[in-house]
């Protein structure tokens, strides 16, 4: 029978000092025999996805106390990728994932907490906390802050739904008036919550449902809706139950590593492919699997991508569909239900809230059970706000149309080819990733001359000045985990290509990564990266690059002898950008670069 970890600090004569300190936090004699639950919050006023979390930790804490536990809250950092985008701030985004994971480990292990509720939301916070949960392997429940409502704006022929990416694209389009840009800017992000499309934050929060570590609705209930309050309350009660089942009942099935097994990771990736999730999820799932000791690799993702269809298209792949629409169609449990009916889901895996995924789907899939139809009718309020649970509006009816609705059955899939693909070839021997759900069918096969840039900044200048021409492959290198360092997101280059009318006329290839808001023929995570001696570091402007998504290949059409000669020269001169970059690399970033690994391994640390 496992012993409560917290008893290390609450029992025995030699812990009198520790108990004295616990008492100073408000604990009483009766509390020392209760499970101590860490409430891992990530409130910050810098990030709209986290601005409303300030009081939610204490909401969970109150429920933990009511259920017989003791809650102790602390905070992690949280970087807003949208605000950090387009300047050196983005160098810190991916490294913050490791800092978050470490900070959770430090706090939980230093104070011997028995279990955790992780209150996350945005891009690197959910992955960082997920890595920590699997590293620590103590009972854990995830509950996120929830998606933002989609913006609404009246332009031209009527009202349009929009999001952050629309504002970025329009701002770079010279044909759009200053007045319209201001209107879109003021309308794109109307409420608190994670950005409203299937970007990285929402993708990861959805995947926690598939992994079995969060409650149904975690990925799709709007931040503003009162139904999300119930998720926080239920999480508080659930975590105490899980802690008692483990420490008092020796039930190891509730532990994160027992829930997030290889099959669960397959389910999560299957979901991601079926809904065209962010390519960043590949990076984060690989890192989480590493922490869990699960042998889940790029090769597994490649195999899944070849047999999982696209059942749901959400912005940026489909501009008029946002997370509120996914929820109305049955949320993540609705998509998982369709995957199950197609024979693509492992349903004997356990979850924190149900004995199996099969049992969870029997209860929460709107097609097979009407018990929670009201829950999935939760609608946006349409009123700008920074407050959680501020409205209770509901749609009159659900979207259960599986032929032409937001969520499709496998028979009526948007595409039988999955929403993500892994490409291999001499340009990416260890693989690279493309979000096929955002690629127009006309350019699934694409060949063109490379236009090489040694940084994201240089590519942006060239795109905006009109130097990049139709048919070219924009190649941005030395932006990988080590070369950046920090593996910047390339949302600005992809957005600016769209604004210049080149979204379907050019490709973009990089050893960096892409925002979940990116679309078009955007190929990232090229591995090995340039800074590690990857072939991407040998490409010269004018070289022909051949991309074949249906056959999963990417090829640099340069003779092997020429590549060998270029490699010898590069080995002599060093693997670094050919042109100097005005980029300040601090000691913190240098430390990250010295330990990080390739994107094909999830950019985990090699220590």
From Swiss-Prot:
Positions bound to Mg(2+): 81, 123-124, 489
Record pathway: Amino-acid biosynthesis; L-isoleucine biosynthesis; L-isoleucine from 2-oxobutanoate: step 3/4; Amino-acid biosynthesis; L-valine biosynthesis; L-valine from pyruvate: step 3/4
Swiss-Prot/TrEMBL keywords: 2Fe-2S, Amino-acid biosynthesis, Branched-chain amino acid biosynthesis, Iron, Iron-sulfur, Lyase, Magnesium, Metal-binding
Listed Gene3D superfamilies: IlvD/EDD C-terminal domain-like
Location of N6-carboxylysine modifications: 124
Signal peptide stretch: none
Cofactor note: Binds 1 [2Fe-2S] cluster per subunit. This cluster acts as a Lewis acid cofactor.
Co-factor requirement: [2Fe-2S] cluster; Mg(2+)
GO BP, one annotated term: isoleucine biosynthetic process
Pfam families: ILV_EDD_C, ILVD_EDD_N
Recorded catalytic activity of this chain's protein: (2R)-2,3-dihydroxy-3-methylbutanoate = 3-methyl-2-oxobutanoate + H2O; (2R,3R)-2,3-dihydroxy-3-methylpentanoate = (S)-3-methyl-2-oxopentanoate + H2O
Active site: 515 (proton acceptor)
Residues holding [2Fe-2S] cluster: 122, 195
Enzyme Commission designation: 4.2.1.9
InterPro entries tied to this protein: Dihydro-acid_dehy_C, DihydroxyA_deHydtase, DiOHA_6PGluconate_deHydtase_CS, ILV_EDD_C, ILV_EDD_N, IlvD/EDD_N
A GO CC term attached to the entry: cytosol
Reported function: Functions in the biosynthesis of branched-chain amino acids. Catalyzes the dehydration of (2R,3R)-2,3-dihydroxy-3-methylpentanoate (2,3-dihydroxy-3-methylvalerate) into 2-oxo-3-methylpentanoate (2-oxo-3-methylvalerate) and of (2R)-2,3-dihydroxy-3-methylbutanoate (2,3-dihydroxyisovalerate) into 2-oxo-3-methylbutanoate (2-oxoisovalerate), the penultimate precursor to L-isoleucine and L-valine, respectively.
Family: Belongs to the IlvD/Edd family.
Subunit structure: Homodimer.
Name under which the protein is recorded: Dihydroxy-acid dehydratase
């Amino acid at each position: 029978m496992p012993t409560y970890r917290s008893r290390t600090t609450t029992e025995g004569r030699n812990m009198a000092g520790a108990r004295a300190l616990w008492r100073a936090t408000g604990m009483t004699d009766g509390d020392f025999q209760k499970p101590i639950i860490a409430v891992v919050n990530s409130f910050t006023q810098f990030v709209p996805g986290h601005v409303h979390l300030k009081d939610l930790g204490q909401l969970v804490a109150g429920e933990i106390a009511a259920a017989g536990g003791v809650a102790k809250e602390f905070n992690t950092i949280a970087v807003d990728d949208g605000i950090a985008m387009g300047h050196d701030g983005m160098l810190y985004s991916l490294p913050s994932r490791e800092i978050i994971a470490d900070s959770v480990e430090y706090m939980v292990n230093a104070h011997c907490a028995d279990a955790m509720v992780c209150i996350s939301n945005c891009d690197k916070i959910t992955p960082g906390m997920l890595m920590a949960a699997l590293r620590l392997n103590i009972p854990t429940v995830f509950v996120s802050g929830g998606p933002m409502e989609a913006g609404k704006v009246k332009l031209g022929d009527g009202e349009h739904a929009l999001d952050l990416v629309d504002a970025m694209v329009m701002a770079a389009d010279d044909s759009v008036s200053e007045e319209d840009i201001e209107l879109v800017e003021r309308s794109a992000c109307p409420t608190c919550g994670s950005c409203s499309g299937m970007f990285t934050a929402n993708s990861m929060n959805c995947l926690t449902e598939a992994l079995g570590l969060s409650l149904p609705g975690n990925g799709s209930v709007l931040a503003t809706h009162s139904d999300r309050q119930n998720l926080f309350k239920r999480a508080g009660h659930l975590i105490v139950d899980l802690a008692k089942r483990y420490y008092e009942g020796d039930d190891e099935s509730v532990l994160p590593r027992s829930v997030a097994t290889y099959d669960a990771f397959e389910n999560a990736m299957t979901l991601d492919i079926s809904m065209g999730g962010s390519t960043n999820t590949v990076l984060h799932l690989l890192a989480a699997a590493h922490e869990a000791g699960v042998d889940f690799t790029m090769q597994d993702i490649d195999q899944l991508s070849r047999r999982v269809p696209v059942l749901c298209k959400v912005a940026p792949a489909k501009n008029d569909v946002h997370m509120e629409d996914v929820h109305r169609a049955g949320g993540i449990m609705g998509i998982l239900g369709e995957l199950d009916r197609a024979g693509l889901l492992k349903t004997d895996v356990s979850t924190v809230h149900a004995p199996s995924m099969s049992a969870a789907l029997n209860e929460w899939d709107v097609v097979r059970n009407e018990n929670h139809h009201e829950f999935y009718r939760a609608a946006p309020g349409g009123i700008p706000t920074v407050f959680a649970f501020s409205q209770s509006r509901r749609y009159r009816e659900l979207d259960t149309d599986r032929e032409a609705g937001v969520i499709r059955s496998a028979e009526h899939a948007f595409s039988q080819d999955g929403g993500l693909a892994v490409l291999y070839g001499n340009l990416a021997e260890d693989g690279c990733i493309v979000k096929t759900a955002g690629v127009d069918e006309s350019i699934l096969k694409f060949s063109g001359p490379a236009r090489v840039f040694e940084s994201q900044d240089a590519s942006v200048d060239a795109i905006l000045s009109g130097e990049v021409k139709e048919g070219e492959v924009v190649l941005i290198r030395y932006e990988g985990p080590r070369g950046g360092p920090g593996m910047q997101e390339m949302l600005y280059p992809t957005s600016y290509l769209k604004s210049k009318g080149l979204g379907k006329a050019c490709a973009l290839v990089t050893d960096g990564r892409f925002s979940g808001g990116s679309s078009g023929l955007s190929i990232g995570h090229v591995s090995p990266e340039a800074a590690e001696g990857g072939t991407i570091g040998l490409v010269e402007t004018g070289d022909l690059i051949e991309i074949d998504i249906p056959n999963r290949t990417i090829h640099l059409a340069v003779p092997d002898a020429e590549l060998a000669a270029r490699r010898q020269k590069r080995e002599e001169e060093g693997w670094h950008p050919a042109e100097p970059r005005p980029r300040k690399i601090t000691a913190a970033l240098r430390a990250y670069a010295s330990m990080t690994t390739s994107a094909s391994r999830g950019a985990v640390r090699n220590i």
